[in-house]
């Protein structure tokens, strides 16, 4: 099984294993960079992966999109996610489940000046 397909199955397994009999909707916080935000799609509001996840999960879930284009996982990166407004919004959302997709922008040479 390729890695991407495994990741999708893992996320769905975690989300779907949450009890469906909960009294209030289960909140899923999608935290990440431009991929989470939906950059490159015609309409991130409907075509980003968090929007697609909301459609798949239905009304028993509330999926929040807290993607920030260019965000890094590194605290000393060129755009640390924890210093972005989306981070605080994600914390205030207080999701029951978090899907984190960060790290792509951490390969930026600005964040590794001593690497040769």
Protein language model regions, located:
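Bacterial N-terminal signal peptides that target proteins for export
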Residues: 1-9
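Bacterial N-terminal signal peptides
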Residues: 8-17
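A short hydrophobic/aromatic micro-motif that marks alpha-helical segments and, especially, helix-coil
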Residues: 17-18, 48
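Boundary at the C-terminal end of the N-terminal hydrophobic targeting segment
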Residues: 20-24
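Conserved SGNH/GDSL esterase-like catalytic core that processes O-acyl groups on lipids
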Residues: 25-29, 35-116
């Amino acid at each position: 099984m390729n890695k991407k397909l495994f990741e999708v199955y893992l996320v769905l397994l975690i989300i779907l294993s949450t009890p469906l009999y909960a009294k209030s909707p289960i909140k899923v916080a999608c935290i990440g960079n431009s991929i989470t935000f939906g950059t490159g799609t015609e309409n991130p509001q409907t075509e980003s992966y968090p929007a697609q996840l909301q459609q798949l999960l239905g009304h028993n879930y509330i999926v929040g999109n807290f993607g920030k284009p260019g965000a890094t996982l590194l605290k000393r990166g060129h755009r640390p996610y924890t210093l972005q407004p989306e981070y605080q919004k994600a914390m205030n959302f207080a999701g029951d489940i978090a899907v984190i997709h960060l790290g792509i922008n951490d390969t930026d040479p600005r964040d590794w000046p001593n690497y040769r």
